[in-house]
Amino acid sequence: MAAKEVKFGNEARIKMLRGVNVLADAVKVTLGPRGRNVVLDKSFGAPVITKDGVSVAREIELEDKFENMGAQMVKEVASKANDAAGDGTTTATVLAQSIVNEGLKAVAAGMNPMDLKRGIDKAVIGAVEELKRLSVPCADSKAIAQVGTISANSDEKVGILIAEAMEKVGKKGVITVEEGSGLQDELDVVEGMQFDRGYLSPYFINKQENGTVELENPFILLADKKISNIREMLPILEAVAKSSKPLLVIAEDVEGEALATLVVNTMRGIVKVAAVKAPGFGDRRKAMLQDIATLTAGTVISEEIGLELEKATLEDMGQAKRVVITKDTTTIIDGVGDKAMIDSRVAQINQQREEATSDYDREKLQERVAKLAGGVAVIKVGAATEVEMKEKKARVEDALHSTRAAVEEGVVAGGGVALIRAANGIQQLCGDNEDQNVGIKVARRAMEAPLRQIVANAGEEPSVIANNVKAEDGNMGYNAATEKYGNMIDMGILDPTKVTRSALQYAASIAGLMITTECMITDLPKEEKPDVSASSGGMGGMGGMM
C-alpha cells in the first residue's frame, strides 16, 4: 500500500479552500448576460470556447492533491446541479464558494463547525420554501421562449426555436439537439412513430422519385420471430389480398423464400406489401413491438403467448392511416389505436422511467413515450465553424434542460433576484444557539453572491446594485444586459424554480461537508527512479568499436 500524506485542521482547510477558489473563479466568469468566455485547450484539434460552467469545471485538475480535492468537491456541486435540472451549474458553484469561504472564516474564529452546518441547512430549507412560494407556473410559449433565451446566454432565436418545438411535440415530447449542416438553426419535427429500420428490399419502393415506400391505410402485421417460410404467411396474405389494402410486415427478420414471395407479389401487383425489421434488440424489441401494437390496435404474433402466424387473422392486424418507409427509417402516421390504451401504455412506460437506474435506459424510455405520444422534434444547430458549433450546441442543450425544468416547477425572477427575496423571507429565522445563527447568516450572505457576480461580470459595482435590489421588493431587480432596473418577469428575465432550488440545495450540501472537514488524506507522490540505461555511458561490451 502506498504511503499517505495527512493534513489536519486549519492547514487542511486552507489548502482545500485554495482549490475551491481556483475552480470557482474560473467558472464564475461565465455567469450572466455579460458573462465572459473561457478558452479550453484540447490535446488535439482547435481550442474550445465556452460559456458553459460545467464544461469549464470538468477541465480543471490541479497539481497539488489537497487543493485538487477542494476543486473536485466543487466540481461535484456543478455536476449534481446539472444532473438534477440540466442548468444552474455556475450559480451552484458561486453559492458553494461563498458558503465555504464565509463558513471557514467562522470556523477559524472559533465557531462550532457542526452547528454552523445545522444553521446553513435550516436556512436552505426555509429559502427553498420561500422559492416555492415565489414560483409562477410556466405555461405559455412566450414564457418558455424567455427561459430558453436566458439559458442560451440571451440568444433569442434559440428560445423561440425551443418554444416552437415544445408546441409541436408537447411539453413532455422528445426534443433532441444535433449539429446541422448549414449556417442557420433549423427545427425538424417527425410526426407519428418513427423507428430506425428501413425496407428489407428496394423492390418494395413505390415512389421512385424519392426512393420511398408509401402505404395508404395499410394492415400492419407484427411478428416477434424470423419469417423465412412463406407457408406461415399464406392465410394472412390471401385475406389481405381480398381486402385490397396494402400490408406492412414488421418482424424480427423476413428472409429467404418469404421475402422473395412478398417481392414477387408486390411487383406483379397482386398485393401491395412492404417488410421491415422490428426496432431494437432483445427485450427492448419486444417492448417496442408492443408499443406499435398499442398505437395501431394490433396484436403481436408471438409464440411465447401461444399465437401462431398460420392462425393469424385480419383482427390481429394493426392499422394506420399512412406508413412511409425510407432506406433507413419507418414512420407510422395516425395509428388507429384507442387513446385510452395509448395513455395507459404511456403511463406504464413513465413509471418504468422513474424506476430506471441508468441514464441510457431513462433516455430510451423517454423516446418510447414521445413516439407513442405523437412525435420527436430535432433542433439542428447551425454555425460557421466547428468551434462555434460545439459552443452553440452546448448552449442549446442547456437551454432545453432549463425550459423542461421551468415547465415542471415554474419560474422565479432571474438575475439572482429570487435568491435575494428568499434570503429576505428568512430574516426572522433563528437557530438553537449563536453558532447556528451564524450559519444562517452565512447562507443568507451566500444567496447574494450570484447577483453580485452577474453585476461584476457586467463591469458594474456589485455592492451598490445589490443594496438597491435589496431595497426593492417582489420581482424588481437589475437587468445587467441593459443596465436598467425593473420587473424581472416583465423583462423576460426568468429562472426555472427547479434550477435555482437545485443549485442552492447542492451547493449547501457539499459546502457543509467541506466546512466540517478536519482531516485530509492523499497518496504521497511516487519518487521517480533514475533511468539506469540513460545514465550508463554507452552500450556495454562495445567499448572498442568505432
From Swiss-Prot:
A GO term for molecular function: unfolded protein binding
Keywords: ATP-binding, Chaperone, Cytoplasm, Isomerase, Nucleotide-binding
Gly residues: compositionally biased ranges: 537-546
PROSITE patterns: CHAPERONINS_CPN60
Compartments it resides in: Cytoplasm
Record's subunit section: Forms a cylinder of 14 subunits composed of two heptameric rings stacked back-to-back. Interacts with the co-chaperonin GroES.
Family: Belongs to the chaperonin (HSP60) family.
Entries under HAMAP family matching the protein: CH60
Designated name of the protein: Chaperonin GroEL
